[in-house]
A protein has these predicted regions:
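Pre-recognition alpha-helix immediately N-terminal to the DNA-recognition helix
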Residues: 19-21, 79
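Helix-turn-helix DNA-binding motif, specifically the short coil turn and the N-cap/start of the second
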Residues: 31, 42-45
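Alpha-helical residues within the helix-turn-helix
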Residues: 37, 48, 54-55
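Residues within the alpha-helical elements of helix-turn-helix
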Residues: 24, 38
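Beta-hairpin "wing" of winged helix-turn-helix
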Residues: 54-64, 71
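Conserved segment of winged-helix/HTH DNA-binding domains
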Residues: 2, 68-86
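Short capping segments at the starts of secondary-structure elements
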Residues: 16, 26-31
């Protein structure tokens, strides 16, 4: 990974809500409502941050009937978050 790519990833993860969302999704995939309950923030805020994470290729949605579940798909992001947890 070059510095430009690393900078883009770090910029996205630089927001505390997005970092918390990614951390939660690393533990287990979940839908918007579960994230709202876990983080105690408005659904619209969670949806905005999920869209940004999805647009950057950090998370992917998966449909389960009418529910969309999200999971972290970028291993570089997983490594970064693991380092930050230490």
């Amino acid at each position: 990974m070059d510095f430009r790519e690393a900078s883009k990833i770090l910029k996205v993860l630089g927001h505390p809500v997005r970092l918390e969302i990614v951390h939660n999704l690393m533990r287990d995939e979940c839908n918007v409502n579960n994230i709202v309950k876990r983080l105690d923030i408005p659904q619209s805020t969670v949806s905005q941050h999920l869209r940004i994470l999805q647009d950057r290729g950090i998370i992917n949605p998966r449909k389960e009937g009418v529910i969309t579940c999200y999971s972290v798909v970028d291993d570089r992001v997983r490594e970064i978050v693991e380092i930050l947890k230490e």
